Design a protein with these regions (language model features):
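Extracytoplasmic substrate-binding proteins
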Residues: 135-203, 295, 302-327
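A short, structured surface patch at a secondary-structure boundary
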Residues: 55-108, 116, 122
């Protein structure tokens, strides 16, 4: 549910599973020189084998961009238009841009003849199109699977990417940092405190429901948060569900977690107003415990177009910092 605050608004604005056999790679074979010749792994669609070294890599899943960039993986084509400016690939003119999911330039993938396409998230719908355009490419999809724990699914994705690109140690470090951040929040959070998650966008505040809400919903399962409000028939809408500011005020959450959706896509727009202004300048919310006590915690600005494991690690640590400071 989404509501428009009484004062001028702002713009603002994740599901994972347990590591299973799906994330275990088979031993890599080697050629006569001792170099890796192939790697076998499992994704959402089954078992795949890739010949190595890889000569052409394409990426369209925004949850993977930061990881691939941090590992120095060269891309021949990617959904560059979808990337936040925080991703180094946006400065590499040699990468062919496949565009946004709303207006994709899929045919351009043919020119780079990819060995592998890391596909998913907003581009998941184009799996079959890629398969027809470049039938020899291995299409990897590691989106969090429905019904599986979101935190474990983020780690599974990282683990499999590590297997594909020979970055197992780096993947283990990312997962360990993620786990450590989760432990910090678990240690700092009190079940007596109620929590609400919202997405701000276009001057309105959207409700991100426990479990199912976009980006922040899974946190209620990861941390067993006590929900300040639980509305039936909630959705995964990218702007959150409609809700009245009065309903939020009446639920009186002790903590409000915020994704500023527009921070990722409209930060340079002169009409953009930060999500903090939407919430903290709302007269209707001025009496809410979370607002009075400064217990509003914001996700990183690039969250809406990033959403990778690093995004959550950073946010969990910020949340832990805030909660520890209140203890």
């Amino acid at each position: 549910m989404r509501f428009s605050p009484t004062r001028h608004g702002a713009l603002i604005g994740v599901l994972a599973l347990a590591l299973t056999a799906c994330s275990t790679a088979a031993p890599e074979t080697a050629d006569s020189t001792g170099e890796q010749a192939s790697v076998q792994f499992e994704d959402n669609n089954g078992t795949h084998t890739l010949s190595t070294p890889l000569t052409s890599v394409v990426a369209t899943d925004n949850r993977t961009f930061e990881t691939l960039a941090s590992w120095g993986i060269e891309l021949s084509a990617a959904a560059v238009a979808l990337m936040p400016s925080t991703i180094s690939y946006t400065e590499d003119d040699s990468i062919i841009d496949l565009g946004l999911h709303s207006e994709p330039n899929l045919e351009s993938v043919v020119a780079v003849q990819p060995d592998v396409i890391i596909n998913g998230q907003r581009f998941a719908q184009f799996h079959d199109d890629f398969a027809k355009l470049v039938p020899d490419a291995v299409i990897v999809e590691l989106d969090p699977r429905e019904g599986e724990p979101f935190d474990a699914e983020l780690k599974r994705q990282t683990t499999v990417l590590g297997e594909i690109f020979g970055k197992q140690a780096e993947a283990e470090k990312l997962n360990a940092d993620f786990d450590a951040a989760i432990e910090r929040v678990n240690a700092a959070y009190s079940a007596d405190d109620s929590v609400m998650a919202v997405i701000t966008s276009g001057g309105e505040i959207g409700y991100s429901a426990p479990s199912v809400g976009r980006t922040l919903g899974p946190l209620f399962d990861i941390f067993d948060f006590t929900a300040a409000l639980d509305v039936s028939e909630s959705s995964e809408d990218h702007q959150g569900d409609d809700i009245s500011v009065e309903a939020i005020a009446a639920s009186n959450p002790d903590w409000i977690l915020v994704m500023d959706r527009d921070a990722a896509i409209l930060a340079d727009d002169p009409t953009y107003v930060q999500g903090s202004e939407v919430l903290e300048n709302s007269e209707a919310l001025s009496g809410v415990t979370a607002v009075q006590n400064g217990n509003l915690v914001y996700m990183p600005a690039d969250t809406y177009t990033n959403e990778g494991i690093q995004t959550y690690t950073e946010f969990f640590n910020a949340l832990a910092d805030a909660m520890e400071a209140k203890n």
